[in-house]
Amino acid sequence: MSLRDRQFREEPSENALPLDRNHFRPSTEYDQSYEPLEASGQSGDSDLVSEYAQGNMSVTVSEEELRHELSLLGFSYVPRQRLLEFKKDLERLMNRGSAAASPETSRLENESLDDSTNTPPPLPIETSAWHQTSAWPTTTSTSSKEWDNQQRNQDSYTKHTVSLGGNVQATKKAPQITRKVLRRKSDGQTHVSDESFLYSETETEEEDTGSSIVDFRSESSGRSSASCAKSFIRPPLYSLLDQYRQRSDPVGRYQEYKQKWDALQGALERNRKELRWGIREQMMSAPPQPAARSVLLPNTYVIPTDKKRYALRWAVRRDLVNGVMPRGSYS
């Protein structure tokens, strides 16, 4: 007889089930039948243990605890209707996870069958299993292995997920940080690369053994995460020192500018030569223009000796030379 059975025999718990095999099963959320224990194919002890494991593992979560944990995760305001829906789904997942713990139940049944006494060992009763659903690790010192160990020890809805066949499977993956990077190739095409931190091949094989969990994170890249190669940051084609030298090299920059200027001057000189040769060809091909001849016009200039007072002035001059006194009038 084990030490647990002795303690239970000496100090029976208030939650211990009656040992009468003809009693009826209590009405629970998962079992609504009222058949005697004798009608089942198994023995009474195993039925008592399985009944105790299924009936008392029904967990509930209060709204205060749910709001407190959501506030720790960053969701400060959640509507009451959405909170009630989330609470209902959470309790359903917790109860399903508790019912899926079949190895522990089978071990307890084997121990009860091997013992000579009919007293089943007491099982711990949890009124609330919300404390088992901890938030994501907030410290950077926590490694992925510690997170995996912590997830192994936990027995809550965070440890289970729904597979393709509807079975409940345990996952031990730590949260991944996915970063999409848009890179441009030399030919002008763009390529989206995934630089998330992926698991190693051994860890992926251990986690995916016996499970068919659907991974929706690789739908954007068109291939599953198992076939996705490890991403890497492409090294630069030249170092930063070469970039600095290329920027601050005055001689190289002068040579580059000189080559560009010479190429530009050659193009301009070629254009000017073509223009000059075109003008010269036009001048050589055109006939000579005749010289313009001036038109002779009659001279309309009047000589001063032909004026009207010329005769009068000449008479006065003649009289003055000869000493003749002028007369009153010259007619």
From Swiss-Prot:
Main localization, broad class: other
One term under GO cellular component: cytoplasm
Cross-referenced InterPro entries: Centriolar_ciliogenesis_assoc, HYLS1, HYLS1_C_dom
KW Cytoplasm (keyword) present: yes
Any single Pfam family the record assigns to this protein: HYLS1_C
Subcellular location: Cell projection, Cilium; Cytoplasm, Cytoskeleton, Microtubule organizing center, Centrosome, Centriole
Swiss-Prot/TrEMBL GO biological process terms: cilium assembly
KW Iron-sulfur (keyword) present: no
Effect of substituting D249G: Exhibits little ability to rescue cilia formation in xhyls-1-depleted embryos
Residue ranges, compositional bias (Basic and acidic residues): 1-12, 184-194
Keywords of this entry: Cell projection, Cilium biogenesis/degradation, Cytoplasm, Cytoskeleton, Phosphoprotein
Phenotypic effect of disruption: Morpholino knockdown results in a specific loss of cilia, with no effect on the number of cells with multiple basal bodies or the number of basal bodies per cell.
Segments for region (Disordered): 1-48, 96-157, 183-227
Function: Plays an important role in ciliogenesis. Required for apical targeting/anchoring of centrioles at the plasma membrane.
PANTHER family xref list: CENTRIOLAR AND CILIOGENESIS-ASSOCIATED PROTEIN HYLS1, HYDROLETHALUS SYNDROME PROTEIN 1
Similarity section: Belongs to the HYLS1 family.
Name the UniProt record assigns to this protein: Centriolar and ciliogenesis-associated protein HYLS1
Organism: Xenopus laevis
Native organism taxonomy: Eukaryota, Metazoa, Chordata, Craniata, Vertebrata
Gene responsible for this protein: hyls-1
